Amino acid sequence: MAANMKAVKLRIKSVQSTMQITKAMELVASSKLRKAKERAEVCRPYFETMHQTLVDIAQGNTDFSSVYARESGNEKRCYVLIAGDRGLAGGYNTNLFKCLEAASVNQDFLVLPIGKKAVEYSKRNGFACVTESFGEIADVSVADCFEMANLLCGEFKKGEFGHIDLCYTKFVSMLSQQPSAIPVLPLKDLTDEQDTKSIRNLILYEPDASEVFDAIVPEYLAGLIYGAVCESVASELAARRTAMEAATNNAEEMIEKLNLHYNRARQASITQEITEIVGGAEGV
């Protein structure tokens, strides 16, 4: 009985220690999440404006033509896979990888992994990678996103692949994060976004609209990648906060059950001792 009580007490201390860790991780994630949300929200107007600029160029010029805005016939794809650097975030990374697997079924594709987990996943599955230079999502800067965009656009123009897709986790709310695989290039739908403009070619582009368009696309892609990185970081922190909150609650419930078990064992031990004392006294 005493040995059993000692084991329960050690288990309680172990669970309490784990609960302190999960609670601390929950608080850290909550603190970082607010800044990550603000950064993600600040990014959105930038690439929305860039997208509208591209639409205006494509729609406003009858002689418009760009390698970035037409199908090349090359069905090979490149997925920019944005995952986290660490685990302990529930199904955050696993759900993203399932999204990639569903999107890439029966396809010939390359991967540009961003984040430690994305690099590890790509290596483990033997995916061909454009580069593995961005293994820490926490260290990805705006300059890094421009570097990635220029690399991808260069390979796209050379015909290494005919499509570029972003595979990341969209931040919806504190309790909802949505893995998504969205096509980025070619921008073939721009000219389909007609809005009944009756006056065209009011803006003159030098040297011409197509060259301006081709110069803007890498910046647009860099903005999309950076926005997706910000959304992914916010999603990872939200998922980790939720997971650690659930772990803390589970630990509290377990401690309550263990304390109840310990108190019952202690009560039984005391009752047994009293019975033995009474029995001994009666024997005398």
Model region roles, listed by residue range:
Residues 1-284:
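C-terminal beta-strand-loop-alpha-helix "lid" module of Rossmann-like NAD(P)-dependent dehydrogenases
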